[in-house]
Amino acid sequence: YAESGASITSPSPRQFLSLRVRMMTDDPQSAAVLRSVRLNFNPPVAQQLQGELDKGVFAELGQPQEVSLFIKPVFAPQDIGFDEILVRTPPDMSLKFSGLRVGSLEQWENDQVEELTDVQVLETRSDSLWLRMDRLVRRGARAELIEVKFTTALFSSGAVLEAATGNSTLDNSWQQVDPADVTDRAESQGLQILASVTDNKVLSDVQVLP
């Protein structure tokens, strides 16, 4: 960050923290000095957050396709939980919300997951999807796997999505979702989308009429 006191977004809790500092001065007779570093931590929303897209390859460029993002949270007893989900794409992509389902692993196996009907889509940029649920996902909430469905189109050879979860009652509580292989219902093993090598044309069936 550029200003003192600005917030940073942390991944899931880590054992170590690495800092890199660049010090500058406008006076050639004076040297910049770093006297102290102070960090203020928010409580984590979860002990671990992992995510995976259901498809890692788009067959056609420029054509909207529905994608599912599966998020698997792991909670410690003291974690505060989350009720917001944020998904980001590169600037040339846009996101349209389709649905959100939550359930325990047993409910997913038995196709008894709950489709949330009262999900707020909060205003943000077109390349982001900011959702607020009507409940808090936390330890014991029978939400071991979450599916966020949205529609998007790919216009390049590939894109990496970013996801985070947050608690609406706490400022700057966003916590990063790490890419991983979280469920057999998805095949991407991460948060990357690639264009098909067999058909990666943005334009097709182009005709020039007199």
Segments the model singles out, each with a brief description of its role:
Residues 1-209:
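Beta-strand-rich ligand- or partner-binding modules
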